[in-house]
Amino acid sequence: FFNDKIVKYIPIQYVLSRYPSYGINYYQHRPVALTNSQFLPYPYYAKPVAVRSPAQILQWQVLPNTVPAKSCQAQPTTMARRPHPRLSFMAIPPKKNQDKTDSPTINTIATVEPTITPITEAIVNTVAAREASSEFIASAPETNTVQVTSTVV
């Protein structure tokens, strides 16, 4: 089946990483009884039936209830995957508007167009008439009223 000249040059690390079934398995495969109970969120490992020798059965019962190594998980096994319990704070509440009927949305805000209104302001110019003479002028300054029209947007 294999060519001996080719096979003996393959490094053992390549075989172990390429084919995980050849890797070292520190945990023996234990059958899992599927339970759909909220009180047992972890897989229940059933006791093995007496198909193997009594020495292996005693060895199975001594093993701790731990998760298998990564080398076991990479293999296609018949073990059931442990379901992840759903936490209540991660639940997404349903949308509130599911029971409402869809109504078309109407834009009630009308667009406001700016109108140009002319504003009339009165500007008062205060001009003091000065004369070339050096005498004191007691008269009030002259006032001129000019109307200015400006457009404000």
From Swiss-Prot:
Top-level taxonomic group: Eukaryota
Modified residues (Phosphoserine): 133, 150
Subcellular locations according to the entry: Secreted
UniProt-annotated site: Cleavage, residues: 89-90
Keyword line: Glycoprotein, Milk protein, Phosphoprotein, Secreted
Gene Ontology BP, a term: lactation
Entry-linked InterPro entries: Casein_kappa
Tagged with keyword Secreted: yes
Family matches, as Pfam families: Casein_kappa
Glycosites: 105, 115, 117, 120, 126, 133, 149
KW Hydrolase (keyword) present: no
Location, primary (coarse class): secreted
Coiled coil, from the record: none
Free-text tissue specificity from the UniProt record: Mammary gland specific. Secreted in milk.
Entry GO terms, CC: extracellular space
Record's function text: Kappa-casein stabilizes micelle formation, preventing casein precipitation in milk.
UniProt record similarity statement: Belongs to the kappa-casein family.
Protein name listed in UniProt: Kappa-casein
Species annotation: Giraffa camelopardalis (Giraffe)
Gene name linked to the record: CSN3
